[in-house]
């Protein structure tokens, strides 16, 4: 069978024969009738797996470099772009049947995705969700593997939403997902920016590149888009505004923007404020989650919900019912008053925001337990140490997912930013570090464990090792005394 009999591309896009049974970039997922797209990645080149894919039943191969194979090979200038186009064609271009919302930014993306989905659902809008924690398609709920899935998975999730009768999809969009074309062939009706702070410079090299990668989401707004919702207090706001392809741009913030929070009262477990800019008069709001950063997230959610047709008062009132986000500010306490918090904060800005929030929880010392990913931006490591030392009296450095790096070297690079007067230790075993912090903390102290949130494994030299921070917290609290929920309605630390 010739390539043209199986698939071809014209001005309208790719056309696939009924003989095609699927599209994938992973040779291990190939089944008879599949198209295998050979993608060059950071560690592996898909062209090296063409033989394996053909033996598994691939009927055609798409790639950038010709490879001798007993099946048709279609050469393309960009394998990743072709992968997105082929996946969309295979699943019947599901995004065209949905109102798609994209949420990007360094910190806060997952919370905004979860909370906007909740607000839309409470307003009667049938909404699916793709986040870095979970995917909900209307047909099923499953754990996420990447912040933004590879395009064959993402297109399948959108197809399930369409086929389940959902009308809206809220997608967490990472800078990697944008640059690697994972969101290719998806037109967005609304794009949201939380913030842009230091992250992923191992991949983007400069903050300018990183910011411009985020801005590309706003270029994907469809002509009939509801517009963009951006953090007007963020330094990247003007760049994002300039890249918005369609619709009005609505800014939100505490200091700038069309939608603002005034009369802000940050309380230990919640926040109260008045939302201005969504109607003729200010709307009182209560948010059952701590921290100034969550006020920003809530403003983004309310502004976006109104752009999507939710009545302003209803959108703001729903903020009071927003549920916990897995791995974000999960709180437990010991009977003698030690508070333990598990959070995903993994950037200097995110860590600082989390520490500022927990400072309000109790009067005692703050203990932090964290590490840094191996193979990632090394420049942020001492900055993380400086941020931790600014708030915490005790800093316990440990492993995150070191990958192929030496955990002791990673810890030393973080420790370079920690002044000598701060109690700083390196305990390689993460569960042991958590145990030590919980056992040595005194009543009234706070133990903040960050970097991994709900993740269930650590990676050492390509090997995944089970490790759940919340489980380690429960074990440590059991040694000290039974764990109790910290506050009615708060999420207890458990997996």
Regions found by a protein language model. Give the residues of each.
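P-loop/Walker A phosphate-binding loop and immediately adjacent motor/lid segment at beta-alpha junctions
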Residues: 51-52, 56-57, 62, 72, ...
